[in-house]
């Protein structure tokens, strides 16, 4: 008996020792870091979780084309990113990630007020508005607020069980939106920087009926799409997708993709950008059958929100062109992005990318930025709203046609 007790005691002490010897897996963003970059200090930028005073937001540094104006429209929403506009255009809802809130901004005719709709959720990044209801998507929860635009005390309906959410957090902070078909579109990113997803439920885009029924997988091979919109004429879905990290400053670029039919494969994790095989995750003919991107958005640019412009305020040349927000890199030695670009697609299907709004990134060496633009929304009057996740603000970009010069007498 004493021998058995001694063995049991020895085993009890040995088990913790063995568990302590087992190294912890690296955080998801660290995965795929090559030995050649072992000493790199690059890491994701820390977001600001406190309110930024209006006077500390240097909106005057923003640069837009002649005739356009960028101004501070609302502030006081730390971490605010994806936006959903109410049916009447008088309220804007913003999701967040780490801070766990959803905000409501009310436009009372020149003055905006901000309130928190819901708090203490796990990365409620996804917000969508449809037929008077606000939908909120967190990592592990889906809530629907009926009639919230007219009733600030509206209580949520829990739809979580209807949407079959996978458990992993990484790349599953969601952008969600209703399409022209009335369906609710939801992406499910890869739970890693670079890996073969553990199950088929990752790395895809799905669509559902508004109540969560009718689940359909419409795209696979999607690493991390956090922005999409439908072309106003073709009704095709266009979406941004982040390229993998730890591939150097000239590494795999972010993508602008177009879904022309249900079931297309966009390559992840075997094939990236314009047909580049992954150096670690390999298979025979990795790019065979993969749909190539319409345009490349730059390496590590963090291409986020996209909006096809259909308003009447901007000059005609902007009609049916796309605005895409690039939040800005962290996995490059030389910063890239931190801007809004305008994308125009020719009759040949080729896209050209032009700068539109800049100024968030400061000059000089290293990462010196005061803001990080994230998403774009179109208002009923045709103005654009751009959210800034870093300072918790929304900017309004408007256009006024220059007045004709007075004729000389």
Each language-model region and where it sits:
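A short loop-to-beta-strand structural motif that recurs across blades of beta-propeller domains
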Residues: 101-104, 141-143, 204-206, 255-257, ...
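Beta-propeller domain segments
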Residues: 22-65, 173, 190-193, 208-213, ...
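Surface loop/turn motifs at the tips and blade-to-blade linkers of beta-strand repeat domains
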Residues: 72-77, 115-121, 159-168, 217-221, ...
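Beta-rich catalytic cores
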Residues: 69, 76-79, 98, 113, ...
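Conserved beta-strand position repeated across blades of beta-propeller domains
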Residues: 74, 84-85, 128, 177, ...
């Amino acid at each position: 008996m004493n021998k058995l007790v001694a063995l049991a005691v020895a085993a009890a002490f040995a088990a913790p020792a063995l568990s302590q010897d087992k190294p912890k897996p690296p955080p998801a963003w660290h995965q795929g870091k090559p030995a050649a970059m072992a000493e790199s200090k690059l890491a994701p930028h820390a977001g600001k979780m406190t309110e930024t005073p209006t006077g500390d937001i240097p909106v005057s540094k923003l640069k837009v084309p002649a005739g356009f104006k960028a101004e501070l429209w609302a502030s006081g929403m730390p971490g605010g990113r994806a936006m959903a506009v109410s049916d009447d255009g008088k309220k804007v809802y913003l999701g967040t990630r780490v801070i766990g809130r959803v905000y409501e901004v009310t436009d009372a005719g020149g003055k905006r007020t901000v309130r928190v709709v819901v708090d203490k959720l796990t990365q409620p990044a996804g917000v969508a508005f449809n037929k008077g209801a606000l939908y909120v998507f967190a990592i592990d929860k889906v809530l629907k607020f009926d009639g919230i635009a007219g009733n600030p005390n509206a209580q949520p309906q829990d739809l979580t069980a209807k949407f079959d959410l996978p458990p992993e957090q990484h790349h599953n902070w969601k952008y969600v939106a209703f399409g022209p078909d009335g369906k609710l579109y939801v992406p499910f990113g890869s739970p890693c920087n670079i890996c073969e997803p553990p199950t088929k439920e990752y790395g895809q885009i799905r669509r559902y009926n508004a109540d969560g029924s009718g689940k359909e997988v419409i795209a696979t091979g999607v690493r991390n799409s956090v922005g999409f919109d439908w072309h106003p004429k073709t009704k095709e879905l266009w979406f941004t997708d982040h390229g993998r990290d730890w591939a150097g400053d000239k590494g795999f670029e972010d993508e602008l993709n177009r879904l022309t039919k249900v079931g297309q494969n966009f390559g992840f994790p075997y094939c990236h950008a314009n047909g580049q095989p992954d150096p670690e995750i390999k298979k025979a003919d990795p790019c065979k059958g993969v749909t190539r991107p319409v345009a490349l958005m730059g390496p590590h640019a963090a291409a986020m929100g996209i909006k096809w412009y259909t308003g009447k305020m901007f000059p005609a040349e902007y009609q049916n062109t796309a605005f895409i927000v690039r939040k800005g890199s962290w996995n490059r030695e030389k910063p890239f992005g931190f801007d809004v670009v305008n994308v125009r697609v020719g009759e040949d299907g080729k896209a050209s990318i032009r700068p539109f709004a800049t100024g968030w990134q400061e000059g000089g060496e290293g990462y010196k930025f005061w803001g990080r633009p994230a998403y774009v929304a179109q208002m009923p009057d045709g103005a654009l709203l751009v959210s800034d996740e870093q300072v918790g603000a929304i900017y309004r970009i408007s256009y006024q046609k220059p007045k004709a010069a007075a004729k000389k007498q």
